[in-house]
Swiss-Prot record:
Belongs to the UPF0337 (CsbD) family. This is UPF0337 protein pc0632. It comes from Protochlamydia amoebophila (strain UWE25). It holds the Pfam family CsbD. Gene3D superfamilies: YjbJ (1.10.1470.10).
Length: 66
């Protein structure tokens, strides 16, 4: 999925995102709203990922859910 697809399909994939990253709350997911930078920031703060690791995790997720 590309950026536009993620943002457009956010309501449909929120559950999949929450399954993978269970520390994300419903409020977090609403705040993120499919926006890449918001997602990366949450992964960094909740999981202690470096920026590079968060980017890799998010890219891997997108590639898996095309």
């Amino acid at each position: 999925m590309n950026k536009d697809q993620i943002e457009g399909e956010w309501k449909n994939i929120k559950g999949i995102v929450k399954e993978k990253w269970g520390k994300l709350t419903d409020n977090d997911l609403t705040e993120i709203n499919g926006q890449r930078e918001q997602m990366l920031g949450k992964l960094q703060s909740l999981y202690g990922y470096s920026k590079e690791q968060a980017e890799k995790e998010w890219k891997d997720f997108q590639d898996k859910h095309r």
